[in-house]
Amino acid sequence: MFLARHERSAHHPPARTLAGRKALRQSTLERRYDFHLGEAFRAALQGSHDKAAGHSSQALLISRELYAGTADPTRHQPELAAALCAHARYGGSGWQAIAMLAESAGHYAALAETDPMAYEVPRIDVLTRIALASDAAGSTPDAIGLLHEVVGMYLKAPAADQEERDLGLARARFHLGGCLLKTGMDEDGLAETEAGLELAADVLDRLRIRIADNGWLAEAPRYLQLAAPDWAAAAVRSMTLHAEAGRWQQAATAARAAIGVSGGLAGLGGDALRDAHEKISARAEEILAMRNGRGPRGTRTRSV
């Protein structure tokens, strides 16, 4: 009789044992998700895009399993939304990326209905990514239209972290500026870029972050780290355009931002980022010299 009971229990483990195994499996998946998504971000910041795509793919697979494997799918909806956005950025291309971003935006929209303070900004962030994907697919006018809408959304969005929201707005302005410049609207494009740079600098001040050395970005919030590549590119674009027009004071302001932000990225590691920082710094130092009245060979120049 004992053996019969033992055999039955072996074939049909108690419900609490099954629940415990399921909870352990879910906990393991959650840890693996956090690991792969974090590694995707880290690899992307270091310029290892293939590695970032591999990790974001794993994070997406895990998030789908978590989302499908619970009685309350909304519990893991944020993970799925974030993983879709990340993999669209690092592993997607063309309309495939836009499809993943649209799915991500749908999840964030549902989440924002119940908790706008937590999820409205991430929803708008995804719309920025959709605009960039549209631009990459050749639909720059559509991207410009969406980015104009996105800027307006950020300005009205509730946010648990106002600095994160405002840095998202700065990134949208960076990209809007780039798209406008691409279509020949130079004055408007530069104005949007400048507005983004000023807002990003203001966020740094509010966070009390000082760009003292190349290690500053490693201690910054994740959202600031992820914005840094777009920020550095915008600063380089601004300093270049102002320098070409002989506006040395404005060029110098952008040059200092370009040195600081590209230096922060270089401090995160990776030969490509260090090489980029060296090239950016060399050009920025030339611009700063011109601003201070010294030409390439020590000749005096007149500031504008």
List the model feature ranges, each with a label.
Residues R32, E39, L80, H87, ...:
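Structural register within alpha-helical repeat arrays
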Residues S27, R32-D34, R75-A82, A118, ...:
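Residue register of alpha-helical TPR repeats
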Residues T17-T28, S63-Q77, Y108-E120, Y154-D166, ...:
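Flexible helix-coil transition and linker loops at the boundaries of alpha-helical arrays
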Residues L268-V304:
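Terminal, low-structured helical/coil segments at or just beyond the last alpha-helical repeat
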Residues Q46, H87, G91-G94, I130, ...:
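Structural motif corresponding to the intra-repeat A-B loop/turn of tetratricopeptide repeats
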